[in-house]
């Protein structure tokens, strides 16, 4: 399966409004949903937040110029919220999944879908 297929099938198909797969090494984009792109600055901030989860909690996570309040952050996942929507970030060995949801998708369902893809990618060595 291509990286784009993971986005289209597992994330967008699960109800996310936007998604992107970044390299966990340098933050470069491997695939993204149509019209969605995490900026280089945002990607670097995400990488640094996975290295220091306290930074995520203190500074929040900005995706597409929207600052989200961090609810949970550790070395494998970051959950953040803005109004009725939010973002789930999941880090694997080689990737960072970025999945943005709105009020049509419950936060728990968003986390489960993104974490499930992250678990699958880890099992596959990614």
From Swiss-Prot:
Annotated GO CC locations: actin cytoskeleton; cell cortex
Taxonomy, superkingdom: Eukaryota
SUPFAM superfamilies, per the entry: Profilin (actin-binding protein) (SSF55770)
Record's keyword terms, sorted: Actin-binding, Cytoplasm, Cytoskeleton
Compartments where found: Cytoplasm, Cytoskeleton
PROSITE patterns with a match to the protein in the record: PROFILIN
GO BP annotations, alphabetical order: actin nucleation; chemotaxis to cAMP; negative regulation of actin filament polymerization; positive regulation of actin filament polymerization
Main location: cytoplasm
GO molecular function: actin binding; actin monomer binding; phosphatidylinositol-4,5-bisphosphate binding
Summary of the function given for this chain in its UniProt record: Binds to actin and affects the structure of the cytoskeleton. At high concentrations, profilin prevents the polymerization of actin, whereas it enhances it at low concentrations. By binding to PIP2, it inhibits the formation of IP3 and DG.
Family note: Belongs to the profilin family.
Complex and partners: Occurs in many kinds of cells as a complex with monomeric actin in a 1:1 ratio.
Name of this protein: Profilin-3
């Amino acid at each position: 399966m291509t990286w784009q297929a993971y986005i289209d099938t597992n994330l967008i198909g699960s109800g996310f409004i936007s998604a992107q797969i970044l390299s966990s090494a340098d933050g470069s984009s491997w695939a993204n949903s149509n019209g969605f792109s995490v900026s280089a600055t945002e990607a670097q901030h995400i990488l640094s937040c996975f290295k220091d989860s306290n930074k995520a909690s203190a500074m929040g996570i900005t995706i597409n110029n929207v600052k989200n309040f961090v609810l949970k952050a550790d070395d494998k996942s970051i959950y953040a919220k803005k109004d009725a929507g939010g973002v789930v970030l999941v880090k694997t060995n080689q990737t960072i999944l970025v999945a943005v949801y709105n009020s049509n998708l419950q936060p728990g369902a968003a986390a489960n879908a993104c974490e499930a893809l992250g678990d699958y990618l880890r099992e596959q060595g990614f």
